[in-house]
Amino acid sequence: MDLSLLFWIYLINSVILINHEIDSAYWQEWKLVNPNDTSDVKGFLIIHFPMLFAILFGLILIDRGLIAGYVISLIVAAGGIFAFFFHFYHLRKGRKEFNNWLSKLILILTFPISIFQIALTIMDLI
């Protein structure tokens, strides 16, 4: 089995981002956008079914060398970069969510791995 470097970086980034999403449920991430939101986790979980399916399906498509996999790879990596900036913006504003060493480590790891994933995706496409 000859798996590309992109496959492994995508897999690593996906595991990190999925762990971030687990952490997001703990911190009730939806309240970062709307602090007055009194809803519970149900809506948050529902939107994660298609999101996690797309992330995992994208890995299969990358393994098969399909263009859709490369598109999903770029979207997943962009999501990692967005998560990094979104959460550190809120941390700098004094929010308590994600303010522990493991939550921060997960976010910090997403940034360089996502940049590397974008670079590998583009290099594989050209």
Describe the predicted segments one by one:
Residues F44-I60, L109-I115:
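Core segments of transmembrane alpha-helices
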Residues E29-W30, F53-I62, F86-H90:
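Membrane-helix exit/interface motif
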Residues D2-N13, A68-V76:
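Interfacial segments of alpha-helical transmembrane regions
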Residues F116-I126:
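Juxtamembrane boundary at the C-terminal end of a transmembrane helix
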Residues D63-L66, Y70, F84-S103, L125:
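Membrane-helix boundary connector in multi-pass membrane proteins
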Residues I22-D40:
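Cytosolic, membrane-interface loops and tails of multi-pass inner-membrane proteins
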Residues H48, Y70-Y89, L107-S114:
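Hydrophobic alpha-helical membrane segments
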Residues I9-W27:
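N-terminal signal-anchor/start-transfer transmembrane helix
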